[in-house]
Amino acid sequence: MFAFGAVPAIVLLVGMLFLPESPRWLLSQSLVKRARAILERIRNKENVDKELEVINKTLKQKAGGWGELLEPWIRPALIVGIGLAFIQQATGINTVIYYAPTIFEFAGFESAKVSILATAGVGIVNVLMTIVAIWLLDRLGRRPLLFTGLIGMIVSLTVLGFAFRVPSLSGSLKWITVAGLACYIASFAISLGPIFWLIIAEIYPLRIRGRAMSIATVANWTFNMIVALTFLTMADKLGRSSAFWLYALVAIAGLVFSYFYVPETKGRTLEEIEESLRSGKCFKKV
């Protein structure tokens, strides 16, 4: 059974063999021709010379220290990274994944086998909708998908809360729970799931990207630990419906935060995003 976990790792390994080198890394190694060839594959050939020039200029800058993360012009990007990390975890996604069999038992699935099968179904929805998100990200943009997914999560979590609260729904609770969790997972998979990791790879200047991304990643797993450790206690003390409603409130706050602070990075180069940060433009319009 545990050997099945090696299958996605092998698929990832094989897929990585076909990934091209980063043009920035190639230029840092003075491999200009290879960098140009890769840029010509993914960009308009007419703009390649200009982009090579901009990348070369960026590479000449020295790596930034930890103190630079506190500079006013970088602070908005740091807030976005930590904010999205909090929203991704505090809307309860890993709680649902970790405790899905328990949640289905709460809903009335008495057989452990059926609960596990329902959990597997939720996982399949997650994989399929993540593939859909990959296809849509560069077509619709990050912000529209983020808003759509958060709205879907809010609705799903609210419905789940009512399903556990209203006695007259007890007979239908099983299937409302399955449908609600499937919609919740699907909404997450097209929005917060991939977009958090994509955004933190795009919004930070090259000099401090490693440090800034490490902070966002540590924040993400810290919030994950806190939420996972508190779910069962919260469901016991507040009630199962209140737990889902609390996650819905976090999703509402996340929607407001995303509208005002999360930038649209579709079609923008890393250098253009950094220039917008330095110029002090409204981050929403980066």
Regions found by a protein language model. Name each.
Residues 1-40, 59-286:
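Alpha-helical transmembrane bundle of multi-pass membrane proteins
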Residues 33, 49, 53-57:
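Loop segments that connect adjacent transmembrane helices in multi-pass transporters
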Residues 41-51:
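Short intracellular "coupling" helices and adjacent cytoplasmic loop segments at the cytosolic face
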